[in-house]
Amino acid sequence: MARPKEFDRDQALDRAMHVFWSRGFEATSIQDLVEAMGINRGSLYAAFGDKHALYLAALDRFCCTVGDVEGALGAALRDSGSAKAAIRRLFMAAVEAAANLDRRGCMVVNTAVEFCPDAGDIGAQVALAMRRTEAALHGVLLQARASGEIGDRVDPPALARYLTSSLNGLRVMAKTTDDNAALRDIVDVTLSVLD
């Protein structure tokens, strides 16, 4: 008879996500993970496989929760009714998150810096997250163009790539400074392309 699980898998995964997000992959030991997750090594390996597989699961969890750009943009668009305001809210959320999360940055961006370009399946997951961010921004920009919020001279695919790159750069900058006024200045200058 199989022994029942003695822990909440989702809660353990959330805890692992926070450890990896704070420390990165290389600096996180299995001991760090079992202590944070409140489980033993055998349970970790049985439930998640190895450290690499657990990292992939934690990164996916981040993308579906904290780092859900599509959801954040959709909610901001519904709340404000303005594509430009929704994009601004996304950028300002990155500034606010930096201050509220001990300057951890974005787990996806941190992973890109730690692993890429030769990161195999982890790199593929990072690339997918970046494409999803770009696609979400592209969709909002198309709505902005259709509603007349931005002009016809704007190329939505190119602008979505630019905004994705700028958002990721902002997330890196937010790790290096506690000067939120400077970060807001970066947002203002970046988003001036929408005017």
Where do the language-model regions lie?
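N-terminal intrinsically disordered/low-complexity leader segments
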Residues: 1-7
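Helix-turn-helix
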Residues: 11, 15, 19-53, 57
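Hydrophobic alpha-helical connector segments
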Residues: 57, 71-104, 156-163
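Amphipathic alpha-helical packing segments from all-alpha helical-bundle domains
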Residues: 67, 85-88, 120-146, 158
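Amphipathic alpha-helical segments used for helix-helix packing
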Residues: 85-86, 100-121
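Amphipathic C-terminal alpha-helical segment
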Residues: 97, 118, 139, 143, ...
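Hydrophobic alpha-helical segments that form the core
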Residues: 104-110, 136, 152-173, 186-192
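All-alpha amphipathic helical-bundle segments outside canonical DNA-binding/catalytic cores
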Residues: 124-129, 146-162, 180-181, 185
